[in-house]
From Swiss-Prot:
MF-aspect GO terms: GTP binding; GTPase activity; guanosine tetraphosphate binding; translation elongation factor activity
Official protein name in the record: Elongation factor Tu
Subunit structure: Monomer.
Species per Swiss-Prot/TrEMBL record: Marinobacter nauticus (strain ATCC 700491 / DSM 11845 / VT8) (Marinobacter aquaeolei)
Gene coding for it: tuf
Highest taxon of source: Bacteria
Compartments where found: Cytoplasm
Length: 398
């Protein structure tokens, strides 16, 4: 089978379904592929069972079962992730294995918000999912118009509780199963899912591409080249670095400023290095000992070093090669940010005495050295080089 050519002419947006078990996330995922294919003739229709037996992937040493599907509206290409189990969502969102530009919260109109509805909204807030659109599913099972309105109000309240704009969030009511079966009684099937895609188009802004963001490169290695000066190497995470640009070196020690006097790739000199490329950057007047792995090179003022932050963490289970025993407050592992480990101590939330392998928990971490960080930065938790957890910065404290 020849692979279909990937069209790059449409903006690409990453989304995913979230919500309580059995509220219809996977059915809706299948319905989205079917409706886009039928209404706009784009993409391929995928069956429920093609999505439901999600393959397991490994991200940062953690096994996650995830299904990836794609579909197109007339103006956009969507890449959509769906997970079979609650634990997979927790891992997926914390590791950032599937970064979402927006989430589709699926909530059964017959049951209303349930524990995982709340937990997934909280996780979305903690890991920095910027936008949520709601699909009130199974509306064909609810005869009472007032009940639908009540559930809608509950969902809006829940979103507002976690600092999402509950009052302005688009909520589409319908039945994913009807849409999947090609039915559309009372516009609850195909029409509702088409409306959902239109809401995604309108409500989730086009994500800013990595190349348009301010330049940042984690430093992996440092060399001195006689007669030329100091070269730092790494993969450009975002933005563009041009010869002559002023840059800052941030993290671990005091922030310093310098100028890029050369960019090279595969021993060839370039005018610039771009997001995604592995480059060497020559720094003016910087000594070999002034820079180290774990610092970042960036646009001056674009990112600051911090030592204390609140984070959401997933602790690997024993089966995943994690710890065999719980940890308690005052636990001091290494936190691996981008290219280096920094020791830090953990404070647990009030009322939480210990954290078991396989749990997810919110905690406050204090590092022994500052790291260039911003909300949404992912990290691994390690003990002597072995990964025992994954986390994401939810809020910087100092």
């Amino acid at each position: 089978m020849s692979k279909a050519k990937f069209e790059r002419n449409k903006p690409h947006v990453n989304v995913g379904t979230i919500g309580h078990v059995d509220h219809g996330k996977t059915t809706l995922t299948a319905a989205l592929t079917r409706v886009c294919h039928e209404v706009w003739g784009t993409g391929e229709s995928r069956a429920f069972d093609q999505i439901d037996n999600a393959p397991e992937e490994r991200a940062r040493g953690i096994t996650i079962a995830t299904s990836h599907v794609e579909y197109d509206s007339p103006t956009r290409h969507y890449a959509h992730v769906d997970c079979p189990g609650h634990a997979d969502y927790v891992k997926n969102m914390i590791t950032g294995a599937a970064q979402m530009d927006g989430a589709i919260l699926v909530c059964s109109a017959a049951d209303g918000p349930m524990p995982q509805t709340r937990e997934h909204i909280l996780l979305s807030r903690q890991v920095g999912v910027p936008f949520i659109v709601v699909f009130l599913n199974k509306a064909d099972m609810v005869d009472d118009e007032e009940l639908l309105e009540l559930v809608e109000m509950e969902v809006r309240d829940l979103l507002s509780q976690y600092d999402f704009p509950g009052d302005d969030t688009p909520i589409i009511t319908g039945s994913a199963l009807m849409a999947l079966e090609g039915k559309d009684d009372n516009e609850m099937g195909t029409t509702a899912v088409k409306k959902l895609v239109e809401a995604l188009d309108d409500y989730i802004p086009e994500p800013e591409r990595a190349i348009d963001q301010p330049f940042l490169m984690p430093i992996e290695d440092v060399f001195s080249i006689s007669g030329r000066g100091t070269v730092v190497t790494g993969r450009v995470e975002r933005g563009i670095i041009k010869v002559g640009d002023e840059v800052e070196i941030v993290g671990i020690r005091d922030t310093t400023k310098t100028t890029c006097t050369g960019v090279e790739m595969f021993r060839k000199l370039l005018d610039e290095g771009r997001a995604g490329e592995n480059v060497g950057v020559l720094l003016r007047g910087t000594k070999r000992d002034d820079v180290e792995r774990g610092q970042v090179l960036c646009v001056p003022g674009s990112i600051k070093p911090h030592t204390k932050f609140e984070c959401e963490v997933y602790v690997l289970s024993k089966e995943e090669g994690g710890r065999h025993t719980p940890f308690f407050k005052g636990y001091r592992p290494q936190f691996y940010f981008r290219t280096t480990d920094v020791t830090g101590s953990c404070e647990l939330p009030e009322g939480v005495e210990m954290v078991m392998p396989g749990d997810n928990v919110k905690m406050t971490v204090t590092l022994i050295a500052p790291i260039a960080m911003e909300d949404g930065l992912r990290f691994a938790i390690r003990e002597g080089g072995r990964t025992v957890g994954a986390g994401v910065v939810a809020k910087i404290i100092e």
